[in-house]
Amino acid sequence: MGKIIGIDLGTTNSCLAIMDGKTAKVIENAEGHRTTPSVVAYTDSGEILVGQAAKRQAVTNPDNTFFAIKRLIGRKYDDKAVQEDIKKKVPYAVIKADNGDAWVATKEGKKMAPPQVSAEVLRKMKKTAEDYLGEPVTEAVITVPAYFNDSQRQATKDAGKIAGLEVKRIINEPTAAALAYGVDSKKGEQTVAVYDLGGGTFDISIIEISDVDGDNQIEVLSTNGDTFLGGEDFDLALMNYLIDEFKKEQGIDLHNDKLALQRVREAAEKAKVELSPAQQTDVNLPYITADATGPKHLNIKVTRAKFESLVSDLVMRSLEPCKKALEDAGLSKSDITEVLLVGGQTRMPLVQEKVKEFFGKEPRKDVNPDEAVAVGAAIQGGVLAGDVKDVLLLDVTPLSLGIETMGGVMTKLIERNTTIPTKKSQVFSTAEDNQPAVTIHVLQGEREMASANKSLGRFDLADIPPAPRGMPQIEVTFDIDANGILNVSAKDKATGKEQNIVIKSSSGLSEEDIEKMVQDAEANAEADKKFHDLVTARNTADNLIHSSRKAIQELGDKVTAAEKEKIEEACKELEAATKGDDKQAIEAKTKALEEAFAPIAQKAYAEQAQAAGAQGGAKAEEPKKEEDVVDADFEDVEDDKK
């Protein structure tokens, strides 16, 4: 059985970890970084870039570079959040899919579901794990914000499937962080508050870590959060400030210039990071735009105090869910023994200060906020694989679940913060005499009014025998699995007739959609490999042309005019081949040049050996090695290519 990898699929960055023996280890990506930007770009040449490569070219390709896609996953286009919070904040097109979901589109008009885009990030994680382990990887534990609803969890599983991964478990991010902390912690019973402020979402979970018969039991007592509060909002606040200041100075509004906007966005993110250790920073963007008077440069000094004033309301917004989580757990602030900070945004001094003020204790600094979640996911993978045996994890459902009953009321079957997996049943009846069918409308949320909650789906239980209203007994059962995904059934107790569905969002992706996206992803993987191989062949050819011409020049009169002409002709033919897309033609012309150059090289080395006199025997070995000079040059090009 292969490894079950742990993936923190973040809004801004993602992280990968595996179990290495008894400990979880974060794996570096191909670029040597421990986190990967959750950015996917589609280039004009048809190449798909993921991670740092995609982020680097965002300024010149804003329409086709997709970031913060996690904020769209599992959401409807008409959601207030999508219309007000997301569409206005991203340079790429957010469109309405046929099923009502929020999708994205490239400038060429290619439409994609958010899980399809997220799958590209997961594919990179999968490839990184396979390169490290030297074996195929097919299973993963993927984390989601604790406050993700059923649709968002299902969409995350879909993304895994499209990427070629069987998602063995969806685990809440704060729970994963507590797992990472709890497994290393041997300090007896603790009540831990996990404050998780990431790139796009905020979660707070109150978690009890205790020793039960030698096992580390990690039980989530309550969770709360805000799926529209994160580091991206901090970036945006600073970006808008910079744009407003520039407008005051120059009278030009950069909001309508996508290229300039992307540059300011990146500068704002960089300045935000710099203002954690430093008291002030300069944002300097030369040639940001131009008007009739010439080019304009943006140069603005930002102090930490100014930045804090811009985002203080965002930090304060995170404290209300903290209060609710404590109330739901039935605890006071003094009951909390440890506070863990998770998510890159918690590096901000103001965040640390406000969290300390709220809980009345210093947050722990020994947990890596970027990596703890992935480490926890890997540990959960180890538990599922049977490699980690002394850990028991008890998570909760973040939102109440129920059905719509007479008068448009939501009747809750499972209250929020119920430990999962769980199963609850309740008997309902008909509202009319001789009612032949009932519609079960499944809801998620905390409001009394059914229409104010999230609709997860509907299904009908038909063929109810005629009877006066209130007589038939319809048993509705809600069953939540360990991933927090819901299965609902309705049964007529008189006839035994039953109807059930696994709840997806009322839109969501069908199995056919997912299968098509899996095939697209596999086709892209093949196309990506072909593109990579073509680039490698071109680089090899370019390098050989360069080294051949250089050698001819250095050998001078030792090479005849006919030989020079033959080499030059072979170089020109190879150059022509590299301008095309035929890898085999490039390789054939490369071989032809190597063969043309080989006799000249041998003759030159033989002359060198003769000149060496008595040391000829020793020197003769070196020319043999020198025959591999082309290979050594190839490796230099490989480095460049990376």
UniProtKB/Swiss-Prot annotation:
It comes from the Bacteria. Keywords: ATP-binding, Chaperone, Nucleotide-binding, Phosphoprotein, Stress response. CDD domains: ASKHA_NBD_HSP70_DnaK-like. Signal peptide: none annotated. Residues 628-642 have a biased composition (Acidic residues). GO terms for molecular function: ATP binding; ATP-dependent protein folding chaperone; unfolded protein binding. Gene3D superfamilies: 1.20.1270.10, 3.30.420.40, Actin, Chain A, domain 4, Substrate Binding Domain Of DNAk, Chain A, domain 1. The keyword Phosphoprotein applies. Transmembrane segments: none annotated. Induction: By stress conditions e.g. heat shock. Residues 609-642 are annotated as: Disordered. Pfam families: HSP70. The modification Phosphothreonine is found at residue 201. Belongs to the heat shock protein 70 family. NCBIfam families: PRK00290.1 (NF001413), PRK05183.1 (NF003520), prok_dnaK (TIGR02350). Acts as a chaperone. This is Chaperone protein DnaK. It comes from Francisella tularensis. The lineage of its organism: Bacteria, Pseudomonadati, Pseudomonadota, Gammaproteobacteria, Thiotrichales.
